[in-house]
Amino acid sequence: METFLFTSESVNEGHPDKLCDQISDAILDACLEQDPESKVACETCTKTNMVMVFGEITTAAKVDYEKIVRSTCREIGFISADVGLDADKCNVLVNIEQQSPDIAQGVHGHLTKKPEDIGAGDQGHMFGYATDETPELMPLTHVLATKLGAKLTEVRKNKTCPWLRPDGKTQVTVEYKNDGGAMIPIRVHTVLISTQHDETVTNDEIAADLKEHVIKPVIPAKYLDDNTIFHLNPSGRFVIGGPHGDAGLTGRKIIIDTYGGWGAHGGGAFSGKDPTKVDRSGAYIVRQAAKSVVAAGLARRCIVQVSYAIGVPEPLSVFVDTYKTGTIPDKDILVLIKEAFDFRPGMMAINLDLKRGGNFRFQKTAAYGHFGRDDPDFTWEVVKPLKPKA
């Protein structure tokens, strides 16, 4: 049997780049909660003892940016300098301006346009992907790496492993076989976890706890065997972490946010962007389209691309490829997709309820992936029925 290895990585919510994503989306949530028409393009950067939020926001909402920054850092666990950042004592810098009037008139005509006439906020192309190898219709490598990261945070916060600190990274290599274009996972080849820890714990204790409390509950036993390789804190020491260890920036974990290297990526990040930014809304709707194709049994694996021009409502192109796994021709699947999904930005915002913020709606997406999540707020994960014409 001919097989191959494929690897996906993840980082958990205390990684400095992910901290920035969560702050940007927490600000988006706060704006949309008060003013669903908010136009938000919010970036965050962080380094030792400093968080800065900057960008363009036009909103009627009254938002305390500094309060949101500090509370988000605190929720993640950055409560003292020795864990990487002190939420209450760090410097918070804010440089927020209004959206460019040139962009505003071209995209939404200063709010005079009907939803179906709202133009894309920028040019770009986005990809959605789905595969039948997991119940989530997501790649197994990505699912396992992401769930390991989430479990790391869970056992830190519930004090199962009190030596854990917020920063951490995971990576999973899976051995696959290609079944006529569909991906069949055979076994987990390698598991890598690098997690921040306190001064008191030994490397042996770290390895034992990670195997027992993180790996065992997450990776199904059928994928592990005597030959599975474990690299558990292979650098030997990871006490300094968070923004103290590395600078962080919004939008630097776009593969972790999506499909772990499977499918394709148009390059646009998600966090801190309202739904007129097709980097986000376009990527969400093509995930829904690809997932609907696989869920309907029309293909075992599917990728969908959409592209836009700034100020133009209709997409420039829609593309589908089922990797030769389709039960009907790809051109017929494309017809079904175009009939079932409205790719105009104003309509995507309505149909996926993307103007609704608050209650951590978008902040939740900013750690542990935007896709494959079982959560009613992830409206783009709800499949649409697709039936070929008789």
UniProtKB/Swiss-Prot annotation:
Catalytic reaction annotation: L-methionine + ATP + H2O = S-adenosyl-L-methionine + phosphate + diphosphate
A molecular function GO annotation: methionine adenosyltransferase activity
Cofactor: Mn(2+); Mg(2+); Co(2+); K(+)
Protein name: S-adenosylmethionine synthase 3
Pathway of action: Amino-acid biosynthesis; S-adenosyl-L-methionine biosynthesis; S-adenosyl-L-methionine from L-methionine: step 1/1
Record text on activity regulation: Inhibited by 5,5'-dithiobis-2-nitrobenzoic acid (DTNB) and N-ethylmaleimide (NEM) (in vitro).
InterPro entries: ADOMET_SYNTHASE_CS, S-AdoMet_synt_C, S-AdoMet_synt_central, S-AdoMet_synt_N, S-AdoMet_synthetase, S-AdoMet_synthetase_sfam
Residue numbers binding Mg(2+): 9
Enzyme Commission number(s) from the entry: 2.5.1.6
Quaternary structure and interacting proteins, as annotated: Homotetramer. Interacts with GRF3.
UniProt keyword Magnesium, yes or no: yes
Major enzyme class: transferase
GO biological process: lignin biosynthetic process; one-carbon metabolic process; pollen tube growth; S-adenosylmethionine biosynthetic process
Main localization category: cytoplasm
Cofactor binding notes: Binds 2 divalent ions per subunit. The metal ions interact primarily with the substrate. Can utilize magnesium, manganese or cobalt (in vitro). Binds 1 potassium ion per subunit. The potassium ion interacts primarily with the substrate.
Cystine residue pairs: none
One Pfam family recorded for the sequence: S-AdoMet_synt_N
Keywords: ATP-binding, Cobalt, Cytoplasm, Lignin biosynthesis, Magnesium, Metal-binding, Nucleotide-binding, One-carbon metabolism, Potassium, Transferase
One cellular component (GO) term of this entry: plasmodesma
Binding residues annotated for L-methionine, in chain numbering: 56, 99, 246, 277
UniProt lineage: Eukaryota, Viridiplantae, Streptophyta, Embryophyta, Tracheophyta
Recorded family membership: Belongs to the AdoMet synthase family.
Binding site for ATP: 15, 167-169, 235-238, 246, 252-253, 269, 273, 277
Chain's role: Catalyzes the formation of S-adenosylmethionine from methionine and ATP. The reaction comprises two steps that are both catalyzed by the same enzyme: formation of S-adenosylmethionine (AdoMet) and triphosphate, and subsequent hydrolysis of the triphosphate. Involved in the biosynthesis of lignin.
Subcellular location: Cytoplasm
Effect of residue 167 to N: In mto3-2; accumulation of free Met and increased resistance to Ethionine
